[in-house]
UniProtKB/Swiss-Prot annotation:
The keyword ATP-binding does not apply. It comes from Sus scrofa. This is Nuclear transition protein 2. Coiled coil: none annotated. One of its GO terms (cellular component) is nucleosome. Keywords: Chromosome, Developmental protein, Differentiation, DNA-binding, Metal-binding, Nucleosome core, Nucleus, Phosphoprotein, Spermatogenesis, Zinc. GO terms for molecular function: DNA binding; zinc ion binding.
Length: 137
């Protein structure tokens, strides 16, 4: 009987130990072989919906991946929205430069031009070195 509960992933067993005996009831419910009394309610709910409503611990156990996906889905959505806004403002690479200028016009214009020149020269040297290295290799 214990081996069945141990066969579950460790991540699931940890919240159970925190939640207490209620989680054991759901463990028995999810494992119909172990619990005969709860098997009827499990057959009706198929996913311990009754035990879910009675205790919150099974929700953390059974729908852990569901909760994670739900919690992750709203958080990246505002990020995607922000990225979408930037992409609309700056659809191309030169557009991103104009965006940076619009945010910090005075400071970025002079510095950016110098940096651009340095970056371009560095990139050229790097590409030449890489290409020559590849040829020799």
């Amino acid at each position: 009987m214990d081996t069945k509960t141990q066969s579950l992933p460790n991540a699931h067993t940890q919240p159970h130990s925190n939640s207490g005996p209620q989680s054991h009831a759901c463990n028995q419910c999810s494992c119909s072989h172990h619990c005969q009394n709860c098997s009827q309610s499990c057959d009706r709910s198929q996913s311990c919906s009754r035990s879910r409503s009675s205790s919150q611990s099974p929700t953390g156990h059974r729908s852990l991946p569901g909760h994670q996906s739900q919690s992750l889905s709203p958080s990246p959505s505002p990020r995607h929205r922000k990225r979408a806004m930037h992409s609309h403002r700056c659809p191309s690479r030169p557009g991103t430069r104009s965006c940076s200028h619009s945010k910090k016009r005075k400071n970025v214009e002079g510095k950016a031009n110098k940096r651009k020149g340095i970056k371009r020269s560095q990139q050229v040297y790097k590409t030449k070195r890489r290409s020559s290295g590849r040829k020799y290799n």
